[in-house]
Design a protein with these regions (language model features):
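Extended non-catalytic accessory segments flanking core domains
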Residues: 1-213
Length: 214
């Protein structure tokens, strides 16, 4: 039978001390509990892979928001984040699993035990960045999310101990005042080329607006 409920979880207190991989490898496959309150901070891969990232000590800031640009400083910043990060995974390596509800609406849910999804805490179908998870319990696992290059340490919540989200960053009822008029502008920096007319092609010509490769 399944005796997982009889196992006493090993406590983990973040940030990790020592080598992160060594720390987690010594606990791989174990049922663990994080003693810290963790903050929902990253959910870019939620819809694709069914995973979110939680951090001890609050939501992390961009390095240059609190420090001047520095290669060494940024490296240390990433190292510090790796000691505070927890990936909660839905234990389903399928990509872009359909999240449509029976009524045809598409919702984004937070991952829970057994590869499923459930409703969030701020309404019928979502959580927000900044919400909290306390007493996170699950099986520690090293695996990929569903695509190559995504190997990482992950927590798989169990049916007996699903992740519970507490509202800590409620959605404002009305947009906050910005203190004046603003003008929004945008620029496509992903295609901001300085060599658009330079090409190694001998037959297609340059990539200019009137070129054959546009």
């Amino acid at each position: 039978g399944n005796n997982l409920a009889q196992v006493t979880p090993a406590p983990i207190d973040l940030p990790v001390v020592g080598v992160v991989n060594d720390f987690y490898e010594a606990r791989e496959g174990m049922k663990v509990t994080f003693v810290d309150s963790l903050t929902v901070s990253e959910y870019f891969e939620l819809a694709r892979f069914g995973q979110i990232e939680l951090f001890e000590g609050g939501r992390p800031r961009q390095f240059t928001e609190t420090a001047p640009p520095s290669v060494a400083g940024y490296t240390a910043h990433l190292e510090a984040l790796s000691r505070r990060r927890v990936i909660v995974d839905d234990d389903d390596n399928g990509q872009n699993v359909s999240l449509n509800d029976p009524n045809g609406s598409q919702f984004i849910y937070h991952p829970t035990a057994n590869g499923g999804f459930s409703v969030g805490t701020q309404g019928s179908d979502f959580f927000r960045g900044g919400d909290l998870v306390s007493g996170l319990t699950g099986v520690l696992d090293w695996s990929f999310a569903g695509a190559s290059g995504t190997d990482a340490w992950r927590i798989r919540p169990t049916a007996a101990n699903p992740a519970t989200f507490t509202v800590a960053n409620p959605r404002p009822a009305t947009p906050p005042a910005v203190g004046g008029a603003i003008r929004a502008v945008g620029m496509n920096l992903l295609n901001y080329f300085t060599t658009i007319d330079t090409t190694a092609s001998t037959g297609s010509g340059p990539c200019a607006p009137d070129g054959l490769q546009d």
